[in-house]
């Protein structure tokens, strides 16, 4: 009976510090869509919510991971140029350098506004969000149409000018910034929604559309995007597709390989590949769009996307739960799959080190479970169409989990502000790490039972020299392993690498779950792919990009870039 009363508190009252906004004004308040992109519609006993946003651009709360948004940080962040990487990379001597004739030619294509030579603008475009990778490009082009991208690439290919496609520049592996002086092709001006079918839910848009803007458009139509990222306020759909971004909804809706129906891509020689199909079924030969999904702009530049979007469901619930150990987190996941079934839409976890960093380095955040300290925290979201049905299933799940001793404490968000606060803890971890100083980031896929083993072994290895943080998408086996230190140190890096890659390979994991390879992991691809597979990938690269001008030095080992 005591357990039932505890569960009832968790469902009806929650943690007083979290739910009593009069007594706790430190929690962030926002209106509009949550991090997951859904409008939270709670049953009446749990509170009401405005069901519709008339002007989404005016009222939408944005969580942005852009350098502009995060420019003012509490701690200085070390900048690290490519030349200071452990493995030196040589510029491919066959690539030409920009001259005045090239610039004049680009101005004829784009006009004055589409050719950017301003040093301050280029300074931002040359550096990644983490301020870890820095290139030296002297030119950024901003095409506004497919034809303009085609003409740009045709000229660059004829002159052997290397280029790097860039969207929101929110990547974490150095994939969207130049290594040397590559021409930056920024697709942000190509941001039109071309069509949307309200019956099928199929959206066709240009590559420069910001993910959150697409979510806002779809929200009015009664749909949502099938992916959600912490960087949604800055990242662009073309970059999402080219990196096969995963995010918070993969557990429910799967990867972009399953949701993207078609793409338009421009080959290095300027050829426009129109694969912008809107059919769920098309079994006519090779499905070439999959070559470009996850290719990180190395085979062609994606300019348009056709994507299947699911309906926005009205009943959404969010739990923030505590666990004493990682074994309980695993059992809780199994219990959630069994008890919640198809309404389970997110299952995220973070360890106590991650929580401590967020509380210390992210402004406006407080612990929703302040009464005790726990080793792990789990964020669970359910999404369905029947509030009563979903609430009953959630109650059953929570009661069973508490009776089993899996969750000693937890809260259920009672309104959108509380849910936003919980999501902000999880999504704010990258910003908190950035504010804390230097950070070494590893995005790994592992068997779920092995994820915390790597975190613990890394802590043993590094001891007190750095803080080892473990968090991620537990529901799909994606660990975000982060090592936080006061500054970048090659001696520390030598203790992390290649250990983390060898450990991952030994346990049949992947060294990149969703961030891609970029520059950071190009020379590490052999930890996840056989030599035969890498050779075949190189053959595809040679076929589509014989001059190697598209995003060089990325994905494939640097030796290949020089030899090509």
Name each model feature, range by range.
Residues 2-564:
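Noncatalytic alpha-helical scaffold of FAD-dependent oxidoreductases
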